[in-house]
């Protein structure tokens, strides 16, 4: 019985490795799309196609942030103007949209991965596996210039927040 189990386990690992190889090959070729479409797009025949109503919301998020509106205020305004059918607009969702390269038409594959051995927990790819970046993969919803400005502002705001003292006695000892 243990021989049968060991053989079945090896077969399962072999199938998994073959599937991963096929996915990575499609990533290299620029033809791979994962299962989830980002907000603003729908998947049609392995293509990301803009959904115009959602694309307008994405553009609103970018334009608001570029004129100085913060992510908290953007989320609050989205909940007033564009309530979600299945929930609430959160600051984290706004930040993810602002940081996602898919909105300039690019795809960055294998930012995270699941290792072959146990425990099978998804982890950040810090060079363990190759990453693939495909430019102009699909129609952009915002310009590269807008995206780059937003990334600069996000980085600056993150640095400012880290340097703020949260207590009157911080750095006094």
Where are these regions (language model features)?
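Short, basic alpha-helical nucleic acid-contact segments in DNA-binding proteins
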Residues: 93-112
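Catalytic and ligand-binding motifs that coordinate phosphates/metal ions
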Residues: 23, 27-28, 76-79, 124-173
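Basic, short loop/linker segments at the boundary and entry of helix-turn-helix/winged-helix-like folds
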Residues: 44-60
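Surface-exposed extracellular loop regions of Gram-negative outer-membrane beta-barrel proteins
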Residues: 68-76
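Short helix-to-turn junction characteristic of helix-turn-helix DNA-binding domains
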Residues: 61-69
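Phosphate/pyrophosphate-binding and catalytic-coupling "lid/hinge/switch" segments at subdomain interfaces
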Residues: 1-45, 109
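Short, basic interhelical loop/turn and adjoining N-cap
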Residues: 79-93
């Amino acid at each position: 019985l243990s021989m049968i189990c060991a053989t079945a386990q090896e077969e399962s690992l072999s199938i998994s490795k073959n599937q991963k190889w096929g996915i990575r090959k499609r990533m290299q070729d620029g033809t791979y799309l994962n299962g989830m479409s980002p907000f603003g797009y729908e998947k049609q025949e392995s293509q990301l196609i803009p959904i115009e109503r959602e694309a307008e919301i994405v553009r609103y998020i970018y334009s608001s942030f570029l004129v100085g509106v913060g992510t908290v205020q953007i989320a609050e305004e989205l909940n007033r103007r564009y309530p979600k059918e299945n929930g609430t607009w959160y600051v984290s969702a706004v930040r993810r949209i602002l940081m996602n390269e898919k909105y300039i038409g690019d795809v960055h594959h294998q930012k995270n991965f699941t290792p072959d051995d146990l425990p099978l927990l998804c982890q950040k790819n810090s060079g363990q596996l190759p990453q693939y970046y495909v430019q102009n993969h699909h129609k952009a919803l915002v310009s590269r210039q807008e995206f780059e400005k937003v990334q600069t502002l996000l980085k600056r705001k993150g640095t400012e927040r880290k340097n703020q003292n949260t207590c009157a006695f911080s750095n006094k000892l």
